[in-house]
Regions:
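Binuclear metal-dependent hydrolase catalytic cores
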Residues: 1-71, 145-171
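Fold-independent oxyanion-binding glycine-rich loops
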Residues: 30, 50, 75-77, 97-98
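Cap/insert and terminal regions of metallo-dependent hydrolase folds
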Residues: 61, 70, 77-166
Length: 171
């Protein structure tokens, strides 16, 4: 994929060896079938990753922890994993995608969670603030109605993500 000259993203090949003034990335393999978080970074900031269900397309959720505060990025997922709900437990901020409406069917549900499921994950996890992101045309058609579904199932603060928005994270 990143091979110089032949890869679909060949222009990014410098990330593999640090050439072209790009930061060298060190790939970390995470088994898509693991049900326990994998530590990606440890130090003043800790980052853990967990595979999340997104049809046949691999996806990872991330938990970033600084002191007592944490932000969990749900990533693209269909919301069917109790392991993820545990992973997101007591997050200061939970960022979840809202790309499909409540009435979505078929393939969309293999990839994405309905608004009601987004709400139940946030509520069960005890998230402090829920940030809704990754809107698609089908969820934007009636964004207010989709957010209302989330509000019915989640009592905490809800933020509609927008580019360059700043969200205060407290512990």
């Amino acid at each position: 994929m990143l091979g110089p000259g032949t890869g679909a993203y060949g222009y990014l090949s410098g990330y593999l060896d640090g050439s072209g003034k790009l930061v060298k990335l060190v790939p970390l393999e995470i088994d898509r079938d693991t049900t326990t978080p994998v530590e990606v970074l440890d130090g003043e900031i800790t980052i853990d990753a967990l595979p999340v269900p997104h049809g046949i397309v691999p996806a990872l959720g991330f938990r970033v922890t600084v002191g007592d505060a944490s932000i969990v990025f749900a990533s693209d997922q269909n919301g069917s994993s109790d392991d993820f709900t545990d992973f997101a437990s007591d997050a200061s901020v939970l960022v979840m995608h809202l790309p499909v409406p409540e009435e979505a069917t078929g393939t969309a549900l293999q990839l994405h969670a309905r608004p009601g499921r987004v709400a139940s994950i946030a509520a069960e996890a005890g998230a402090g603030t829920l940030v809704l992101s990754h809107f698609m045309a089908r969820s934007l058609r009636d964004l207010d109605a989709n957010v209302d579904v989330v509000r019915k199932g989640y009592d905490g603060a809800i933020v509609i993500a927008s580019d360059l928005a700043c969200i205060v994270v407290t512990d």
